[in-house]
Amino acid sequence: AKDVPEVFGLSSSSVSRQFIQATAHKLRTFQERSLEDLDLVGLILDGKSFGKEEMVIALGITIDGQKVPLGFVEAATENEVVCRHLIQDLVDRGLQYQQGLLAIIDGSKGLFNAVTRSLKGYVCVQRCQWHKRRNVTSYLAKGQQARIKRKMQKAYEKPTYNEAKADLLSLKPELTLMNQSAV
């Protein structure tokens, strides 16, 4: 594969420069596009690792459940300053939040503070179930994790909030016996 550019009379560095220029243009277009026409009901913010790089990613959720990539920022952590900057960029590009948004985040205090302070009173925050499940089970012995994950998932699938809450609260005594930190 590394010999392919030479077959066409191109140097590897020339191909690399052209690739960087083309992708930089597409990235700039993505990061600067207007968000005004998006009718969103939800906003997912999460930090992700890509090799040695860390990114905070923003996805919008439409009324019909479609996820729309909105933007991202390279950052070492999900700290409040970085996340507020990302949210402000989304607002500057036309993110409509005045009708209210559901923000789905992990347990990061930086993300929570950034969302609640940036969208002042127009946001309801929900903890991501996947992150919560992972955090709880990380305190348990390997042999206990799958069973507790299943019980938590079964609770999340209940048809009403009250039923789900009751099932999750019923796990508390069991988790307390396994490891108090899991509660």
Feature names for model-found ranges:
Residues A1-L10, L175-V183:
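Proteins with a high burden of low-complexity, intrinsically disordered sequence enriched in S/T/G/P/A and R
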Residues N113, R117-V183:
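Extended amphipathic alpha-helical interaction segments
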